[in-house]
Amino acid sequence: EGFNILRRIGRCLPQGYFVFTSNVDGQFQKAGFDSARISECHGSIHHLQCLSTCCDSIWPADDFLPEVDTEKCLLRSEFPRCPYCGNLARPNILMFGDWGWLDGRSDQQQQNLDDWLRRVERLLVIEIGAGSRIPTVRRLGESLPGQMIRINPTEPELGRNKGVSIASGGLEALRRIEAALNELAAEPGAAETCR
């Protein structure tokens, strides 16, 4: 439901939306967000790269269908292999101290985000659940011009004059934001808005 609310809000904005996420699970794509408007700064579990980095290739993990013994937490199926050298493949995600991560896909996504940001006249960042332990998302939102809505139940603090902080879970806050936008849209003389 939260993803749907975000998509509805994004579709109503003059320049649309762009997602910047440190999540590697592909949930924005699964929820129907345009993959050309997503930047996954730590990579994606749905893409693979060669473990020995024989090349700079990153490929979709669509053909890897893991069969897992959930009781023993063991992979039953074959490990994925590099289509170029036959060595083991790994998820294209950035781990701590990971000098072998190939960042080409994430760099291209970041370039797409940068291009979009240059075209946006009035930026609004909606940050949901980003914490200070791995502050990549927080730092980006704070560094950008424009206003921000920070939604975080435990770390909602936001710099002065930067925007609004909401000490709440993501779904609850998004429901309240959407309800407020709908109320504004229903007022006499309100600008035409999408629903």
Spans of features found by a protein language model:
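Conserved catalytic alpha/beta core of Sir2/sirtuin-type deacylases, generalized to analogous enzyme cores
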Residues: 1-195
